[in-house]
Amino acid sequence: MNKFIKKINFIKNFSSCENWEEKYLYIIELGNKLSPFPEKFRKNSNLIPGCQNDSWIYLIYENTKKIKFYGDSNSLIVKGLIAIIFILHEDLKLSEILTFDVKPYFNKLSLTNYLTPSRVQGLSSISKFIKKSARCLLIKEKIL
């Protein structure tokens, strides 16, 4: 998924799903659209702590001042949840990521109502990992 769908389109599409099964399939579909995860990023430093499944995230701050998101998981649903979180963070500046809260979006979509407690914890871990990565990129940019 080189270019994510916009937040508004995601919310519209997700909300138009008639039942949880359709939403679940849509989440998996989003995960399948993620850009391939480069093997060189598949290391322990990019492994998301607190996820039951092996899941990786890597952020690149490009010369265009855009953030390139990479994510992968050995769970289809977690991979889709990573894609959703990337969609919600799309077009944010590094500094905005530090204060961005995904919870209102999850509440609006009732997403956490349909997930197991461990998946909800995984969402929190993914969000924290993205904030940590953004903070590291900000520090690196200020030093360079």
Curated annotation (Swiss-Prot):
Key word Transmembrane helix present: no
Keyword set includes Cytoplasm: yes
InterPro entries: Cysteine_desulfuration_SufE (IPR023939), Fe-S_metab-assoc_dom (IPR003808)
Pathway: Cofactor biosynthesis; iron-sulfur cluster biosynthesis
Active site: 51
GO CC annotation: cytoplasm
Any one Gene Ontology BP term: iron-sulfur cluster assembly
Compartments where found: Cytoplasm
Superkingdom assignment: Bacteria
Keywords attached to this entry: Cytoplasm
Membrane-spanning parts: none
Coiled coil feature spans: none
Family per record: Belongs to the SufE family.
Subunit structure: Homodimer. Interacts with SufS.
NCBIfam families for the chain: PRK09296.1
Purpose of the protein: Participates in cysteine desulfuration mediated by SufS. Cysteine desulfuration mobilizes sulfur from L-cysteine to yield L-alanine and constitutes an essential step in sulfur metabolism for biosynthesis of a variety of sulfur-containing biomolecules. Functions as a sulfur acceptor for SufS, by mediating the direct transfer of the sulfur atom from the S-sulfanylcysteine of SufS, an intermediate product of cysteine desulfuration process.
UniProt xrefs under HAMAP family: SufE
Protein name per Swiss-Prot or TrEMBL: Cysteine desulfuration protein SufE
Organism: Wigglesworthia glossinidia brevipalpis
Upper classification of the organism: Bacteria, Pseudomonadati, Pseudomonadota, Gammaproteobacteria, Enterobacterales
